[in-house]
């Protein structure tokens, strides 16, 4: 069994959805996870914002336009009139849910129901098209097996049990279509795995079923050794370890959701990154194997805030560091990077939601310096401390760029540093 995930751009037009169908219709047992078609989630977020603010006229206009787009998509995708009618009826039924919200109260629970419609419609359209091609397939609803617990973490035991029950109901079927991103929560309410969550869905399904391989299909041929939007002449990296891939995803490689590696690593399931526009390309294989290439790839994470805490000596050193951790934990703000000395601590964060609260409390114990518009650049590879010389190469390459912070040693797989956003392109 393979699990294959296709993102929004891969199914974003009629032609691309038809192309994906050619990639999945063979007899190999597989579960196919689809995102909403490209741009749909953005439209649904705008509709949800209108509904939340009771901007009903704007919501009406956006719902009407999106409904028309999907009906046109179905008309272009399907030629069989009976299947076309079924598909359009399904679309109209899903949009009835949206129209209902223009009359009723609207909360964060209803917002998640709005956002779920994109994946529900894209998977239904693929299901109908495969039926037109006479390809046996079953449309599974992710709400029937994908669940997060009270801590908002996936309930893997529940997912495995319910998913196996679903598959057992369809003996002889090799192709299943389901939604990425969407799920139920511990209270049986509609919820989701946040932006980019379709990768996470595929990884959770692959882990639950102990799949042979998890394939993430995008519109680029694997993980590149640098950001192709910033640097010309990049090339795909053929092999990465789980840890290397996780570091690259966390530090800005957009091709992969950072959370999707941990479930695959749990059961040692390889993850392959492939290009739906060029399916013959080798892509990138992510596994538990670590090769000897010291430096593999570079990634950058924008919108970083750098904070330096200089102790005012109200607390002894170990209590000072403990207090910093306690206050960041209190406000549920994760640290992207941290370096410390006896009396100074520097951190980099990407979530400034509670920054004013954090600074207000820590000013009792430290002089605080805050700098925004920063970027973390991470150099990733097999960086065992015994391999001398690679640190010098990195520093030599950056000798003309001011480094605000350097982190090395906490991981065997990366050296990370904080720079001004304006220096990012030159650094990469």
Identify the function of each model-found stretch:
Residues 8-9, 37-38, 182-183, 198, ...:
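Short, glycine-/Ser/Thr-/acidic-enriched flexible segments
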Residues 137, 176-177, 271, 335, ...:
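Hydrophobic beta-strand scaffold residues
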Residues 241-313:
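A conserved active-site cap/scaffold subdomain adjacent to cofactor or substrate pockets
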Residues 284-428:
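A conserved regulatory-domain signal marking ACT and ACT-like small-molecule sensing domains
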